[in-house]
UniProtKB/Swiss-Prot annotation:
SMART domains: AAA
Source organism of the structure: Arabidopsis thaliana
Keyword terms of this UniProt record: Acetylation, ATP-binding, Chloroplast, Membrane, Nucleotide-binding, Plastid, Transit peptide, Translocase, Transmembrane, Transmembrane helix, Transport
Alphabetized GO MF terms: ABC-type transporter activity; ATP binding; ATP hydrolysis activity
In-chain residues carrying the UniProt-annotated modification N-acetylserine: S45
Residues engaged in binding ATP: G464, P465, S466, G467, S468, G469, K470, T471
Signal peptide: none
Organelle targeting sequence: 1-44
Name this polypeptide is given: ABC transporter D family member 2, chloroplastic
């Protein structure tokens, strides 16, 4: 509701003041207003949002402040601190200037209305000219203050987004958060919460500073005019705040529930979109319709309760807003009638009264925004603590943990007398020692005391019934699961530099270069066909990196390949596509640099062949294949295995088809573990040479690309 106020009650200088305040309110409550249709913007002192702060927040202010400081402080001590502090100082300087301009307008208004009441046309013309000049000179300060604040907020958000993303993607933290359900919606925290935090923190800080200076300046003016009016203001503002909080406390849970229920409804719609084909095959449209309507009805019913509660609160707030327009006039009117003050002083007292009331009622006016901001601080504080500690305990509280290491073979048999590295014809690639693997959720044992070695040119097939732990074993090899005990050791290329110790990050980089995992459903990145092929080994945007391999700003590139491995050329990529029978898709989709939703436009079989193309380009020492040919026919499956075997890649496969045995020389057979027994539930056996790929290399059959 926008109140239209006559000039004696809300003069132009006061409207300028209130338009500035409303911009602050817009910044502070921006994200909440998008979600809550009951949040309205009104002019002057007519905004009284519904409270939505949890009742127990008062007792947690100290904790909230600590979280706020922990989240906010890194930027102000970062490499961008000089620019940040300079811009912040400029914002505060402009805030002081705008407060001074508002005080000047207050006195201009007094003289302006005095000349009008005295019917002094010459003085009125002069004061009108002063007013127009003051507007022309004052408005740029208000605009520049808001612009400087918004650019600082954008700069802060950019830095924080990169800061949190680096920590989120480090050491597989993102996977641990998702797989163990430690916190909800990390993506929302990285996007919505970070955006809201930076904008609201600056806006609220600016509003507090502005309100403090404003309160001091106009309290002196109001107290000079009529001290009892200052007392009336205190009683009115504190009383209104208390009543509003009391009447609006029922809105707290309703607002939070509304956000959750609407999010649930949106998520249901996203699931329909992502699983459209499966739903269509099942003919499950009616079931989906019922589920969607059920969630919509839940949100609708809660919103109805929210509207009723808001209506009840507005019975008070509307009266509060209207009464404020005549209350100061009613208090000082007897002084005007007795001749103790001029008419312009009435306008001055109304202006000062509205300024001070706005400052005293700041908590009331920003109640809903403050509650939303406190929720943002809670969520980001929780997220920040999680990323800082980087400690993920298994819910089963397993004491033992699988030891996963990456090292190089370094012994006397590997070195000549002059210290150079000997050529090793059968290098060990993987060693598993006494591995007992358990699920991270409830500690159920999947594999008992597994020991196995995989050497160069070995091809191991892991088989077993569904749920026996085949894929879980690969998760343990990838470092995704640590529940259990035992040791897994990957042996890197012996050509690495032994003279330098490797950090954890360097070891992980080495692991990424030497071991590549192919899941059953390959991950299709957002980008071009070229990026699909280069992922995850090389960056697709070389021009954005320095010769040393880092980004221009000094950070590591998103996709890393060890030095000495040249990035494939366009011809290399096309030849590799031909090797996996996908030479036609570049023409089909407009070239290597065309961008599509690849997980939708390519069939699962084509995606699996594309994953094998990545494997051939990366040339890892060891490949872990989790049913990576499940969507392919036997001819294509055989052809792809022949390609990677010819490339000299050692691989470990998981599969159910007996036809896979001919592509391997060893089989690890896993049976379902007996929870009451500690006996091993696995065996390793050799595959008959004549059934293996070694005996079939001369019988190659090239399948069709269709």
């Amino acid at each position: 509701m926008i109140l239209m106020i006559t000039a004696p009650v809300c003069p132009p200088h006061l409207l300028l003041r209130h338009s500035s305040l409303l911009r602050h309110e817009s910044s502070i409550g921006n994200f909440h207003r998008k979600k809550n249709p009951r949040f309205r913007t009104v002019s002057c002192s007519s905004l009284l949002p519904q409270p939505s702060v949890r009742p127990d927040k008062a007792s947690e202010l100290k904790t909230l402040w600590k979280k706020f400081y922990k989240v906010a402080s890194p930027y102000w001590f970062s490499e961008d601190k000089d620019q940040a502090r300079l811009r912040l100082a400029a914002v505060f300087a402009l805030t002081l200037a705008t407060t001074g301009i508002s005080v000047g307008f207050n006195f201009l208004g007094r003289d302006f209305y005095n000349s009008l009441a005295n019917k002094d046309q010459e003085q009125f013309t002069k004061q009108l000219f002063y007013y127009l000049c003051a507007f022309a000179g004052g408005i740029p300060f208000f605009v520049l203050r808001d612009y400087t604040k918004e650019t600082l907020s954008l700069r802060w958000r950019s830095w924080m987004t990169k800061y949190y993303l680096q920590r989120y993607l480090k050491d597989q933290t993102f996977y641990k958060i998702q797989s163990q359900s430690i916190i909800d919606n990390p993506d929302q925290r990285l996007v919505d919460d970070l955006s809201s935090f930076t904008g609201t923190a600056l806006s609220f800080s600016l509003t507090l500073v502005n309100a403090t200076i404003d309160l001091i300046s106009f309290s002196n003016i109001l107290f000079t005019i009529y001290p009892p009016l200052f007392l009336v203001l205190l009683l009115y503002s504190f009383g209104g705040t208390a009543i509003s909080v009391f009447l609006g406390k029922g809105l707290v849970n309703l607002n939070f529930l509304q956000e959750k229920k609407e999010a649930d409804f949106r998520y249901s719609l996203v699931r329909v979109r992502e699983n459209a084909e499966s739903i269509a095959f099942y003919g499950g449209e009616q079931n989906e319709m019922q589920l969607l309507l059920q969630r919509f009805r839940s949100a609708f019913d809660n919103l109805t309760e929210l509207l009723i509660a808001s209506r009840n609160l507005e019975f008070f707030t509307d009266g509060y807003r209207y009464l404020i327009q005549i209350l100061p006039v009613a208090v000082v009117a007897p002084m005007y009638f007795s001749g103790k003050i001029e008419f312009g002083v009435i306008n001055q007292s109304v202006s000062a009264f509205n300024h001070i009331l706005g400052d005293f009622s700041l908590v009331v006016y920003q109640f809903q925004a403050i509650s939303s901001f406190s929720a943002v601080i809670d969520r980001l504080g929780e997220f920040d603590d999680l990323l800082d500690n980087n400690i993920f305990r298994d819910p089963s509280d397993t004491v033992d943990e699988i030891e996963l290491t990456y090292q190089s073979e370094m012994n006397s048999s590997l070195l000549d007398t002059n210290g150079s590295i000997k050529s090793q014809p059968n290098q060990k690639r993987l060693e598993i020692e006494e591995l007992t693997l358990q699920t991270p959720t409830n500690g159920t044992t999947l594999v008992h005391n597994l020991s196995a070695d995989v050497y160069d040119k070995d091809h191991l097939l892991i088989m077993g019934p569904s749920g026996s732990g085949k894929t879980s074993l690969l998760r343990a090899m990838a470092g995704l699961w640590r529940s259990g005990k035992g040791k897994i050791t990957f042996y890197l290329d012996p050509e690495v530099d032994f003279t330098q110790e490797k950090s954890d990050t360097q070891e992980n980089s080495g692991k990424r270069g030497d071991v590549l995992f192919l899941p059953q459903r390959p991950y299709m990145v957002l980008g071009s066909l070229r990026q699909q092929l280069l992922y995850p080994t090389w960056s697709a945007t070389v021009e954005e990196t320095t010769p040393g391999g880092s980004n221009i700003d000094g950070s590591p590139p998103l996709l890393i390949r060890e030095d000495g491995n040249e990035k494939p050329t366009t011809d290399d990529l096309m030849r590799t596509l031909e090797k996996v029978c996908l030479g036609h898709i570049a023409d089909r989709f407009g070239g290597l640099d065309s961008i599509h939703e690849w997980s939708s436009v390519l069939s699962l079989g084509e995606q699996q062949r594309l994953a094998f193309a990545r494997l051939l380009l990366s040339q890892p020492k060891l490949a872990l294949l989790d049913e990576s040919t499940s969507a392919l026919d036997e001819a294509n499956e055989a052809f792809l295995y022949q390609q990677i075997q010819s490339a000299g890649i050692t691989y470990i496969s998981i599969g159910h088809r007996r036809t896979l045995t001919k592509f391997h020389n060893k089989i690890l057979q896993i049976s379902t573990a007996d929870p009451k027994s500690n006996e091993r539930n696995w065996r390793i056996e050799d595959v008959d040479a004549q059934d293996s790929l070694y005996g079939r290399l001369n019988q190659k059959e090239v399948p069709s690309e269709s």
